[in-house]
Amino acid sequence: MIEARSIVLNELAIRTRVLEAGKGPIVLLFHGNPDNADEWRLVMEQLADKFRCITLDFPGYGQSPEPPVSFTYSLTDQIRFVDAVLKAIQVNEPVILVVHDTGGMVGTAWAAANTDRLRGMVVTNTVAFDGFAWFAIAQQWGDTSLVARLRSWLGMAALGLRGGALFKRIFAQQCPQLGSKELDRFASSFAQNGDAKRTTLRQFRQIMQPGFFRDFAAMRERILAAVPCRVIWGDNDRFIPVRFAHAFGCKQVTILPDAGHWVALTAPDALAREIAIVAQA
């Protein structure tokens, strides 16, 4: 059974939600945008008989309110957040880290800074390297000009109208692998969630800053030299094409035909198997 709890990180003035299930070696899962900890429920159910699975809402997503302006979404701040959560829930042993999408950016930075706390890493459909040609809406979200900020604000507001109908229509076209249940969940947790939408704009303005990915090559090398690492990548991803599956540098790369961007939702059993393989390495 998956248990949820809310924790307050006083040192960061942040409240977040943590989901846990099972006992055993720890699997720590980082969600992407525009998702939250619920992304990992199906994977956790697959693993809970052998592992202690832990995931969290990054600040501003899911049931975590938008953080104060003092939290900048820099890699340094996000590493501090992860460390604070792990301290609060008393995680003291090395973990198997599983990352997706924007969670891969945070996860790569955290893992590289904490190889002694890392047992292995599994990467799925993420951007953790320099030179990625960002899609148009991400570029707009990251644009700090007044006109772009206004367009982004209006666009985010429109996504929540009529129960997120516009969002669901757009997202269904971008992610045809997702069913109506997941589209409804995204509409509720993101399109109708003002905190999550404001957080997205704040986060992408940080991601798009020159030099954000400057040190990622060195980070990846540090991780690959320290622990087992595998990539499991959903093909037919409209956001991050399959050619980037090899960009992280892992020797073991599995491509899932037509699984799309959200492997944790479309192929949780395959992802769980990859995690178990890393645990046995």
Region locations from a protein language model:
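Asparagine-centered polar/low-complexity signal
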Residues: 33-36, 100, 125, 272
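Conserved HGGG/HGGXW glycine-rich cap/lid loop of the alpha/beta-hydrolase fold
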Residues: 17-65
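Flexible "cap/lid" subdomain of the alpha/beta-hydrolase fold that forms the substrate-access gate
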Residues: 2-6, 12, 16-18, 54, ...
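Two-component system phosphotransfer/interaction surface
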Residues: 272-276, 280
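Conserved residues at beta->alpha junctions
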Residues: 31-34, 235, 266
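Generic recognition of short, well-ordered alpha-helical segments
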Residues: 38, 42, 109, 243, ...
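Short alpha-helical
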Residues: 25, 35, 42, 105, ...
